[in-house]
Design a protein with these regions (language model features):
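His-Asp-centered acyl/peptidyl-transfer active-site segments
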Residues: 1-10, 37, 55-63, 67, ...
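Short amphipathic alpha-helices and their capping loops
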Residues: 1-38
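AMP-binding/adenylate-forming domain of the ANL superfamily
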Residues: 7-8, 35-53, 121-125, 179-200, ...
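Conserved catalytic core of two-component histidine kinases
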Residues: 29, 192, 203
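Short, well-ordered beta-strand elements
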Residues: 199-207
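A short N-terminal helical cap/helix-turn-helix that marks the beginning
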Residues: 16-23, 134-140, 144-146, 214-241
């Protein structure tokens, strides 16, 4: 009997996440009594041309580069050689959905690992393969992934390309308005947003768990890691200061 797509997808996720006990959410530096939302943003000084050129050299997309760098940063924050977090993607892995108007965004788990001799290129290539395979097997939902492997979305990274607050409709421009919740969606959400060829880091976080200075340090470390990655061969050589 032919194996169903759901079971095949489950076996794929087994091959990546079964038995993993990595905890990458940074230890809180605060212990507030009531959950509160914090928000920070930082414009990165790196030029788009340098990022795109580096992506071409590695043979990966900007999404993989930025996501992979976050994995490295979280591993270093945990003093480990691996990291575990979640990400999102548009859910449009079928060409028939290209022009469909609906909410298809899905959450995926991400597992990053390296050793002292792992090159940045090999690390990014492996992550790219994992991400493409995870998207291809997204019939196995994140809720089932969490239930089976004990994962969660407490630590999430997202790359948002070419964002705009203005939307042309005929001869007019519709102005977008932020309708964010007044509570953080998870303890820590880091995003890279691209506006007019400039990369902006944003952090949405539980301010009862993390101080502004702590989160600001993470954003500074992320930019430092990217600057370092552009000039190094090995993952272990990437500096976050």
């Amino acid at each position: 009997m032919k194996e169903g797509k759901y079971k095949k997808a489950e076996k794929y996720y087994d091959s990546i996440f079964e038995g993993i006990e990595t905890e990458s959410l940074p230890m809180p530096d605060l212990n507030g009594k009531a959950p509160e939302k914090g928000y920070l943003e930082k414009t990165m000084g790196l030029k788009e041309e340098a990022i795109l050129s580096y992506c071409e050299k590695l043979g990966v997309t900007p999404n993989i580069l930025f996501t992979g760098l976050f994995g490295i940063l979280m591993a270093k924050y945990s003093n480990a050689e691996d990291s575990l977090f979640s990400t999102i993607y548009n859910g449009r892995n079928d060409s028939r959905l290209e022009n469909t108007v609906c909410m298809l965004v899905k959450t995926l788990p991400v597992y990053c690992k390296f050793d002292p001799k792992t090159t940045v290129q090999a690390y990014m290539a492996e992550l790219s393969e994992q991400m493409l395979s995870s998207m291809a097997n997204d019939i196995f939902p994140f809720s089932d992934i969490c239930a089976k492997y004990g994962l969660n979305s407490d630590l999430t990274f997202a790359y948002q390309a070419e964002l705009s607050d203005d939307y042309p409709i005929g001869d007019t421009i519709a102005r977008g308005h932020d309708l964010s919740l007044d509570m953080a969606k998870m303890p820590l959400l880091i995003q890279v947003r691209e506006y007019n060829h400039t990369y902006v880091l944003t952090a949405e976080y539980r301010s009862d768990m993390y101080s502004q200075a702590f989160i600001d340090g993470i954003l500074d470390s992320y930019e430092a890691a990217m600057s370092s990655a552009l000039k190094t061969k090995l993952v272990s050589e990437i500096s976050v200061i």
